[in-house]
Amino acid sequence: MARARAGALLALWVLGAAAHPQCLDFRPPFRPTQPLRLCAQYSDFGCCDEGRDAELTRRFWALASRVDAAEWAACAGYARDLLCQECSPYAAHLYDAEDPFTPLRTVPGLCQDYCLDMWHKCRGLFRHLSTDQELWALEGNLARFCRYLSLDDTDYCFPYLLVNKNLNSNLGHVVADAKGCLQLCLEEVANGLRNPVAMVHARDGTHRFFVAEQVGLVWAYLPDRSRLGKPFLNISRVVLTSPWEGDERGFLGIAFHPSFQHNRRLYVYYSVGIRSSEWIRISEFRVSEDDENAVDHSSERIILEVKEPASNHNGGQLLFGDDGYLYIFTGDGGMAGDPFGTFGNAQNKSALLGKVLRIDVDRKERGLPYGIPPDNPFVGDPAAQPEVYALGVRNMWRCSFDRGDPSSGTGRGRLFCGDVGQNKFEEVDVVERGGNYGWRAREGFECYDRSLCANTSLNDLLPIFAYPHTVGKSVTGGYVYRGCEYPNLNGLYIFGDFMSGRLMSLQENPGTGQWQYSEICMGHGQTCEFPGLINNYYPYIISFGEDEAGELYFMSTGEPSATAPRGVVYKIIDASRRAPPGKCQIQPAQVKIRSRLIPFVPKEKFIPKTRSTPRPTARAPTRAPRRGRPTAAPPAPTPRPARPTQQPGSRRGGGRRRGRLNSASRAFRDGEVRLVRPAGLSSGSGRVEVFVGGRWGTVCDDSWNISGAAVVCRQLGFAYAVRAVKRAEFGQGGSLPILLDDVRCAGWERNLLECQHNGVGTHNCEHDEDAGVVCSHQNPDL
């Protein structure tokens, strides 16, 4: 397991600004399965399927029946525009649905020019489009009417959002930050677990999932994420482990038989003490005849036991392949450098340690409690154990079979493993029948034992990817995403590192066979601001898992001890695009419940974005692959902590400014503001700068709206805030630090420091997002 405690292709993701597409159901937009008729402009990507488009079409023609022909001829286009904004990928913004403190609009937010034009030509249409009587009452006052229909965040008003490059250039793609880090989100699924080492499903149509704790308990969860109060399996009395952090012994793996629905058999992998020695044991259990959510503990049948010469490198993965055989992944026996025998256990075909084993649990032969698949690569070799499928393994921690592309089946059956390294490198391998993965001759791409490495008969397969210990020190293998809910992630191999807490990904280029590395970070700004989503996780990434539908999860903990209930299961979410409604519906088979249910209560919270403390960067060395195997190395990734940590903003001095403001003329108070503007603008317009802690700095425009502008304008002696300005419209304050970000004001505050914000100096933006205001002594509605 992991060590002791120390913290297609690129077309699918693009660099971009922090736009926030969201539908009225508070979920990401999608690509409809059929073209839309009324709202055809949203056929490629939006918030309506064919059913909703048909309903809007009915409303459109019902509206036509209530308007005379001449008016309809002039106004039909406006009617279509307004009705179809429910289908916009930014519908939640257009209708103020993303703000729980404001009522949902009945008419989308309009840009001033469009509203003025429509008011002059078709204002009578609004009485048929909206039941809002406040809007009706303003119909005779053009300025107040259009003010009422405006948005605080003018970036999202219709129709300007259609041509806003920042909102449209990355639409529907996973956005990567400036360093190429893919921005994803998480959903908490289970918590309070003691080192959750595995999450599996039974392939029986119930869509239950089972989470194993290192201490020796397995819990059953229903599709609604409630947990059964009675453990599915409890062998904690015989499992060998301890409370000390980093103990690699314990309950390590579980796999359900492919025909579990009919034979009720499952298999477990755990550490056990036998006559003062340490062993790994693979056993078969059967589910109770009386309770399908509980194992019959008396049914244990020991399949295989292997003596461990040390307490670490115990392996622990069990998998069934499409061939129906059970794959067992053992470690090399522990200690440093695989010191056992002339070549170590991993290179010794007569040893079961340091191997991938493959057995047939459905038959027995040669006096064994299992059979040997006839095509195992070393059957008939007197110097080899017939169970051996692959060798040269140090300590593969978490492996998975690729389900294959949902449409073409491409990739199905590939076996991915993360193999934990010694002193320098971690690696990801694709395991093949008879393959030699190099340990202890090689660690990653580099030689470890130079005499073995020079042996021409080694014929080892290099990893598809390796990274140095400046990036992470204990790889946790993951899965190729093949689920239904997030199409952009299809084909992406997602894995992590236990020690550094880094999430990572690999994507194969089908044309070249090369693997492209991308780090995964938690979404910035509003990326993860959807109900139920979070943007942080505990740093010790223990394992990954799939549910029955193919959605992807990982397990991590804040305290890597087998007795500490700090473990959490997270679902990986792409907030940029989802599958069309109805496509991914499941109908779980019924399960009889005989114990109490414990409802799931999430504990983790969304953390507003912050600037992360940078970690060391590194590049893994590469070598020319053998036998045509593709290689990849991380392009100097900058790690990010799992939980964002606050860092003070830059202290680059602002000094005195040329022009209108002289900051040295008097003492300033914290929270005081000033406007800096290009020549020719009125005194009420400019970039907002705020004084805090003896220095001036700028305000980032994330969450910046008219309420924040009102606070600034009132401080400066203006009666009215006309506009909240974004995107450094009044120039960039590049010589100053960014002091405030995600400022959320109600409008009554005395200064910006009294508004909600991320903390002084805590931000994740650049000066091209400097906020500004337009203030006035005159009421803009008159």
Swiss-Prot record:
PROSITE patterns found in the cross-reference section: SRCR_1, SRCR_2
Gene responsible for this protein: HHIPL1
Species the sequence originates in: Homo sapiens (Human)
Protein name in the entry: HHIP-like protein 1
Pfam families: Folate_rec, GSDH, SRCR
A GO BP entry: artery development
Cystine pairings recorded for this chain: 181-521, 185-528, 399-417, 484-584, 700-765, 713-775, 745-755
Position of the signal peptide: 1-19
Family, as annotated: Belongs to the HHIP family.
Pro residues composition bias: residue spans: 632-642
Matching InterPro entries: 6-blade_b-propeller_TolB-like (IPR011042), Folate_rcpt-like (IPR018143), Glc/Sorbosone_DH (IPR012938), Quinoprot_gluc/sorb_DH_b-prop (IPR011041), SRCR (IPR001190), SRCR-like_dom_sf (IPR036772)
Glycosylation sites recorded in the entry for this protein: 234
Residue intervals of the SRCR domain: 673-776
Keywords: Disulfide bond, Glycoprotein, Secreted, Signal
Positions of the UniProt region annotated as Disordered: 604-666
Biased composition range(s): Low complexity: 610-623
Coiled coil regions in record: none
Localization annotation: Secreted
One GO CC term, this protein: extracellular region
Main localization of the protein described in the UniProt heading: secreted
